[in-house]
Amino acid sequence: MLLFDFLDVIGFLGPYIVFVISVIQLYSYSYYLYGYLVIVAVSQIMNTTLKLIYKEPRPSGARSILGERYIGPEKYGMPSGHAQTIFTSIMYLYCVTGKLFWLYLEIFIACLTVFQRWKFNNHTPKQLFVGASLGAFIGYVGYLMNYYFIGDRYEMYMNEKNYLLE
């Protein structure tokens, strides 16, 4: 039982774990790191806004893992914030780095997260699916926006700066 309890905690903390992994992996890609921090904030704002628009309640009988209480917009379950956040991070990091090891590790953590949210009756499968799909979409669009609108300008700025220092 102890192993399953541990995996439940990993699942609950999954978005935070994947966030830390992403920040560490993106540290050497500075403009992608800044873009990531912005896109995660945008994803959170979108999640709260959608919860207030749809007002779809969480399933009855939800269990708490660490004593969390769901008040305000968090009392609504559509879309799942855990699923949305973790899949935003997964998609963005993979698009930037293309590293399969981190993709597989983060997908494993995402599976634990989605399962934990369902097992503890915090979300319906539909809420989890919508959160994961929306998160992957936000991560991909965020990557594209960063690549096309910021990346080229950042590279030109850095090349100019290096030229002036020579």
Where are each of the predicted segments found?
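Hydrophobic alpha-helical bundle signature of multipass membrane enzymes
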Residues: 1-78, 84-119, 140
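A cytosolic-side transmembrane-helix exit/cap motif
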Residues: 52-62, 123-131, 148-157
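Membrane-interface helix-loop junctions and terminal tails of multi-pass membrane proteins
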Residues: 66-70, 113-118, 122, 136, ...
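Short, surface-exposed, charge-dense and proline/glycine-enriched linear segments
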Residues: 87-96, 132-138, 154-159
